[in-house]
Amino acid sequence: MQPWYKTAFLEQYISEFNIDTSLFKSIVEIGSYDCKEALTFTKLFPNAHIVSFECNPKLLPQCRINAAKSERITLVEKCVTDNPDNHLFYLPKKLDGTASICQPRFLYDSVEVDTIQMEQFLSDQPIDLLWIDAQGAETQVLNSFGSKLNQVNTIYCEVDVSQIRYCGGSDESQVLQKLSSFTLSSRLLLNPNESHLILNKK
């Protein structure tokens, strides 16, 4: 079995369904972590511009370094949410990669960050791929699109099967219910509580 890496399932999907990646023009990545996936997107989708959102102050220095490596990456240093008046962001003390706008059920520090709603940020152009890695805040992210969720063609979403890590966080069934206007094209259960979903507009 090949080692797991963040875009492995997406690459498998592209190969299995013979997706013409040259047709992708616009990619939105929410929860960029370090912008390494954004750099991978520039290779997988040679004609796409990637807009990457990350707000974790501990991660932003590395995001800036990686985003600067490609003129096709725009880094937006804001937290995507359906409640932009809430600026509180949680930084777990020990578990790397689990920072969230949702309150964790484990030890954390907190910080205030800039926020944004996607409905206000986006123009009317189509989004070929929406990538979401939001650590429990998936439905908040999707809600922030409002009617502009209709502009999205393909969604890749990492989500907990059962929400046991965050207070008020999303789980897989809630995300699928929110995306009932999309077709679930592929699903990977990476571990008993981590599901990766690829959905397409019906």
Task: Specify the residue positions occupied by each region the protein language model found.
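Phosphate/nucleotide-binding beta-alpha loop and adjacent structural elements of enzyme active sites
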Residues: 1-202
